[in-house]
């Protein structure tokens, strides 16, 4: 596969070659998870992928508990279907434990982890803010490192956030509650990792084992890939090295049109990927920022071509786009049109909408 063919294959699976008429929960299931450190980005990501998507669609899904927001892949907050969270969260626990120990180091060795998690598990049968849980843990484990204890709980227990009536369905600092309480059943014990790998390839493939490990946060997936046998195929990548894929997965022609699309910060199709299928090597410093931030991007012809941000007053909404190079007139016109549509989605109360492009 050429790099351009690889680009189109991934965009097709990500619903970025055309907005799809797909039920919201099915779309989130298709993507496996949308990174969601902040409440707003998943809304923009879904708006760019689905026809006629509204804020109310996602707000309804989280309030009816068919979609949840909780700590999962790579120890980060993701939006997932409730079914997928229950199915896969247990499989991710080894990577969360490793991440916790790596970050805390010797601080973790001073803690009685089983006792700490047992206390927190009982506490989170009801919704609580993490500031409150630290106080609670200090009352039970006098002299303990409250920050370290809070991090152990965040990584060690399957918790989800409680939605609210806020504009983006969650407040900036949401309460957490046990997934078992919120969903009425505990997360499943992890069996084989094969189903997770198959779902990853369906959403993000073709890919290498290292790609899957980087996205899930898991290690040593070579045996899992090997065990899937003829449920996988290999295709030669741009550098000649094999990539794994599903036999029937879409691999469109390289000349398939790719419309302008706006992706939010930390969009899951961008994070953890080292190849150049969407972000050219020369542009990576503009995309992958200090503090583990990933910029909000404009895709032009399927590739990262600009960053963007929105500012607003009570009357005016402004979209500021910083392009990586000067665009032809037709491309600029398409970016401006899509950008204004984005503004009207994220700032519907504004009276005027202004899209600015700088290079």
Locate the predicted segments by residue.
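Long, low-complexity intrinsically disordered regions
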Residues: 1-270, 274-276, 282-359
């Amino acid at each position: 596969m050429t790099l351009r063919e690889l680009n189109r294959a991934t965009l097709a699976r990500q619903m970025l070659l055309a907005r799809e008429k797909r039920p919201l929960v099915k779309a989130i299931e298709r993507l496996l998870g949308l990174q969601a450190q902040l409440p707003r980005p998943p809304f923009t990501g879904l708006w760019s992928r689905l026809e006629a998507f509204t804020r109310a669609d996602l707000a309804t899904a989280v309030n009816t508990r068919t979609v949840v927001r909780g700590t999962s892949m790579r120890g980060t907050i993701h939006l997932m279907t409730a079914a997928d969270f229950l199915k896969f969260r247990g499989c991710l626990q080894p990577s969360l434990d490793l991440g916790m120990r790596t970050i805390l180091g010797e601080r973790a060795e001073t803690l009685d982890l089983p006792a700490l998690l047992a206390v927190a598990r009982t506490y989170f049968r009801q919704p609580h803010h993490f500031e409150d849980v630290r106080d609670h843990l200090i009352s039970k484990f006098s002299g303990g490192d409250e920050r370290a204890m809070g991090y152990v709980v965040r990584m060690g227990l399957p918790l989800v956030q409680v939605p609210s009536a806020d504009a983006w369905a969650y407040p900036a600092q949401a309460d957490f509650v046990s997934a078992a309480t919120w969903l009425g059943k505990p997360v499943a014990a992890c069996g084989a990792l094969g189903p997770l790998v198959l779902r990853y390839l369906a959403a993000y493939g073709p890919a290498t084992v290292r790609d899957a490990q980087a996205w899930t946060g898991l290690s040593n997936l070579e045996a899992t890939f090997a065990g899937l046998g003829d449920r996988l195929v290999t295709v030669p990548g741009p550098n000649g090295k094999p990539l794994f894929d599903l036999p029937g997965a879409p691999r469109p022609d390289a000349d398939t049109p790719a419309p302008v699309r706006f992706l939010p910060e930390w969009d899951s199709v961008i994070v953890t990927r080292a190849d150049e299928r969407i972000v050219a090597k020369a542009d990576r410093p503009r995309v992958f920022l200090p503090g583990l931030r990933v910029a909000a991007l404009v895709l032009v012809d399927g590739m990262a071509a600009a960053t963007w941000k929105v500012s607003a007053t009570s009357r005016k909404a402004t979209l500021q786009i910083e392009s990586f190079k000067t665009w032809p007139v037709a491309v600029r016109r398409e970016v401006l049109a899509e950008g204004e549509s984005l503004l009207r989605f994220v700032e519907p109360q504004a009276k005027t909408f202004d899209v600015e492009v700088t290079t």
